[in-house]
Amino acid sequence: MVLATSLKGAHVLITGGTRGMGEAMVHQFLQEEANVSYCARTVTNTEFDEFYKTLPEGNTARAVGTAFNVASKEAIVDWVKSSAERLGRIDVIIANASPMHMEGETEHWVESFAIDVMGFVELVRAATPYLEQSPQASIIVQSSFMGREFYRSPPAAYGPCKAAQLQHVQELSHYLGPKGIRVNAISPGPILCKGGPWEKYSTLMPEWVEEQRLKIPLKRLGGPTEVANVAVFLASPLASFVTGTNVLVDGGIHVGTQF
């Protein structure tokens, strides 16, 4: 038996879709023939022109980008509305955008809460009326294994805001479940992305990165496509009885390890 995601023709919204794991998610959903609306602070709408050339003949799925700051409730509402009007439906939303602040100054807490927490909250609020009309509605938030357990000292904004996302996933799964909307989180561990923090660490602190690699049971860093594949699964009918859960994509580093 061949497992099919049945995402052809679906409409997926992804925040932070121009680089790293967000970009990989756009790629994977396009390969599944789902149409994508993505956003980032800077968008050219040429980000995926080269990728389209790799799609099989007959795959006409496309991605349309919009530039705005996810910290703006009004911008989120406008984006969701215009995206729904463009394709007449919304089936999946993925809250992926994050400032990834590993610092703990007041401005870092404020921006992290505005994007990681309230950006997720407002995206769900704006999209729910459309998701209620979908036969395969799915909400996914990109959290982190740092939202699950202690990571580092001194205290920083990133981990607690990611923990708030995980709590909200549990609340939403109970509230939206009767409406046929599934809600789940993905918590990546050390993922090596072009332009991402682990690429920077690899350049600035290669010995430290090697120490961390050896702490991972699988003895390697993850890749963005490995996270995107989980997003595709959670968005698809293959995960039709999965809601309120947090999928760790971290090579096993959460099992009793500390950085």
UniProtKB/Swiss-Prot annotation:
Presence of the UniProt keyword NADP in the record: yes
Q: So which domain of life are we looking at?
A: Eukaryota
Catalysed reaction per UniProt? isoepoxydon + NADP(+) = phyllostine + NADPH + H(+)
Q: What is its main location?
A: cytoplasm
- Supply the Gene3D superfamilies for this chain: NAD(P)-binding Rossmann-like Domain
GO term, biological process aspect, one: patulin biosynthetic process
Output a single Gene Ontology CC term carried by this record.
Answer: cytosol
Which residues carry out catalysis?
143 (proton donor), 144 (proton donor), 158 (proton acceptor), 162 (lowers pka of active site tyr)
- E.C. designation(s): 1.1.1.-
What does the sequence similarity comment in the record state about its family? Belongs to the short-chain dehydrogenases/reductases (SDR) family.
PANTHER family of this UniProt entry? SHORT-CHAIN DEHYDROGENASES/REDUCTASES FAMILY MEMBER
Summarize the protein's role.
Isoepoxydon dehydrogenase; part of the gene cluster that mediates the biosynthesis of patulin, an acetate-derived tetraketide mycotoxin produced by several fungal species that shows antimicrobial properties against several bacteria. PatN catalyzes the conversion of isoepoxydon into phyllostine. The pathway begins with the synthesis of 6-methylsalicylic acid by the polyketide synthase (PKS) patK via condensation of acetate and malonate units.
- Protein's UniProt name: Isoepoxydon dehydrogenase patN
Q: Specify the species.
A: Aspergillus clavatus (strain ATCC 1007 / CBS 513.65 / DSM 816 / NCTC 3887 / NRRL 1 / QM 1276 / 107)
